[in-house]
Amino acid sequence: MQRDTNKDLVRRFYREAINERDSSACERLLSEDFVHNGETRGRAGQRQAVDYFLAAFPDLRNEIELILAEDDLVAAHQRWSGTHSDEFLGVEATGRRIEFTSTAVLRVRDGLISQAWDEMDTGAILKQLTG
């Protein structure tokens, strides 16, 4: 079923790009005109965003806790954890371990992720980073 194929694609993206620290997954798994939260980033722009996250949290882990699919959309509720080792959101490295959740809705088109809407509590992240 297409829904299962789409869910597998989303799982693969987070596994390869985040857990395996391979931002080149953006080149393989995202559309050339990839859009994130309304901003056209393309593959290169999203790869930069992944690299920024991985530099700030080199041991970043992503666990998809819930994944649902309908038509061309996949929703994933995720748990993230990592150690703050470089600048992130204007906060210099603290060495603090943080954990947060996010929810993403991703659109799959022609076997690639073409769009994502991501919601995470950046206030909670900053609170953990700044104490």
Regions found by a protein language model. Give the residues of each.
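C-terminal and inter-domain tail/linker signature
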Residues: 1-131
